Amino acid sequence: MGEFNEKKATCGTVCLKYLLFTYNCCFWLAGLAVMAVGIWTLALKSDYISLLASSTYLATAYILVVAGVVVMVTGVLGCCATFKERRNLLRLYFILLLIIFLLEIIAGILAYVYYQQLNTELKENLKDTMVKRYHQSGHEGVSSAVDKLQQEFHCCGSNNSQDWQDSEWIRSGEADSRVVPDSCCKTMVAGCGKRDHASNIYKVEGGCITKLETFIQEHLRVIGAVGIGIACVQVFGMIFTCCLYRSLKLEHY
């Protein structure tokens, strides 16, 4: 009877080892996906960060990159701990899983909270940023972001093209008689912003605030879903690790 129980325990341990190994392979790929989403956000979707008053959007992306790197390292450690049957490595693996779990939950929560606050932030800050910093010394990033925003989303100003009447650049005389930036034009050529007729600029299409809000919210949903989704998967990894740790402990005795 004792021999049967021993074989049963050994069989259970082997099954847990292969289950955890399979999980770690999937976990490593998930880490790659998390890191890719973070890098994708920073590299391709961060053009408009200079227009945001808060750094939450940027912080969320960085958290995902860090979490993704740690996940990939942890996945390799998990495979080593599983096949070497080292309980000290399993403890370290569990702790790292817990840290990553918390990082991804934080990223998901930040994305959700910022998603709720974004409309208020843009209403309070976007117009001021555009009219006070556009083409001002030291704010080249803002100028580039505004031009790209207006061209990409076919809009002009924060709420509408009239916002540019308050622009420090327009009022300074440096605008060379322009009433709106050239990036407001449907066909962008040098000096086209001197004529603000609806046939020339994005006047009836409205301002950029709603379009920028929609753009950022879409990416916050992706960030939040990836963070929370991978965190939920990690719960299974922690359960498998605890089971294998307990199984090895029983075999030891």
From Swiss-Prot:
It is a multi-pass membrane protein. Structural component of specialized membrane microdomains known as tetraspanin-enriched microdomains (TERMs), which act as platforms for receptor clustering and signaling. Plays a role in various cellular and molecular mechanism through its association with both integrin and non-integrin proteins. These interactions facilitate critical cellular functions, including cell-to-cell communication, wound healing, platelet aggregation, trafficking, cell motility, and angiogenesis. Belongs to the tetraspanin (TM4SF) family. It is found in: Cell membrane. PANTHER family: CD151 ANTIGEN, TETRASPANIN. Glycans are attached at N159. Induction: In response to wounding. This is CD151 antigen. It comes from Mus musculus (Mouse).
